[in-house]
């Protein structure tokens, strides 16, 4: 009959605990809260016991969120100045949708991969609960430090959450890059800088909102950039 030391039993117990995933309990949920800098200086709070992630919002952001929730909304736009939290809103909205719909696919778009890496994607990673989630180096995958992420494949630009939903990290520099794929929703950041191909991109993305769970909505976050394709579409 085998016997185990107290240390061996403790090690086995810790191993079982470490292998217990959040997916074995309840899928994490996101709640919208009102800004409370003294309580949540980062504008977000993660409660691991309840699996609830709270994102703070201000009035204009809440109006944009309400627009995305309206029935038959194809496109919602949040137009605001620099430092207004528009990219924060887009990232948080996308994460909420991705957690709400299991085994689905969502798309986060930046101007191009180089610009998005240091802005759109970085902000998206920073909105994940956990420590140092926004840091990505040759030897460190920050998003994988989040309790709601199971994998970040930087080669394929793919973030997989604990509910098996994938967030595809995309680029708008070629309008037909994602033809043939399916998405439950799309967040397009800095749309005002996409150029005249935005009309073709919009038509293509609209045809891709099918086949998987999601609100079937596109959220544009942008700063005004004159009378261009984005202006025409929003008007």
Predicted regions and their residues:
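Phosphate/NTP-binding elements of NTP-utilizing enzymes
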Residues: 2-235
